[in-house]
Amino acid sequence: MCISLLRRGFLVEDSLVGFLEARKATEEKGLKLRFGLRISMTDSLQDKESSCVHKIVIFAKNSEGCKRLNKIYSFAFTKGNGAIDQKHLEKYWSDDDLKLAVPFYDSFVFENLLKFSSCIPDFSFTTPTYFTEDNNLPFDKILEAKVSEYCSSPVKTKSIYYKNRKDFEAFQTYKCLCARQFYKKATLENPNLDHCSSTEFSMESWLEKNER
């Protein structure tokens, strides 16, 4: 069952730290690594007053795409304080090597709808793919309806962070430890984790819907 998921799934990470390890592991299993980098995007790196920061996912289509991902990541974390804007993203862009996706959570749609931001990203240099999900969160349906205003054919996806629903508390504990901040103490009762209130981000949930 896990192999079935791996053959159909994509690995999306917030950094490139685990890329080489992931490539080695998939090669050992005879699988093709389909890798995406989730990164923050802002309207303008020059505008220090801009409060709009949202997530995008950039997938590498080939080896050249991996090189471009590395350049984008390096720029964002050396000159962009962890983010990139349209001007600099377009500089490294190639539709032949990269694919841009708008994730369901933490995207500009999410930020505008649920956090009253005013994000106006410029994706004119490419054609993004929009994702939707259903993880039994109270705002999933509202957000999905809003996504449909930007894209008539979004792709249904599933974020998987742990194996079984019973592993949710262990995952939550891990995230609390990783996100410790001196000024904002995290606990299981108050983990300070956005939309971390569902046990549906599991492989078990995906299998129930796809392996019947």
Region spans (language model):
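Domain-core and long-helix interface of multi-subunit machines
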Residues: 1-29, 64, 68-172
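Phosphate/diphosphate-binding loops
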Residues: 32-45, 52-55, 155, 162-167, ...
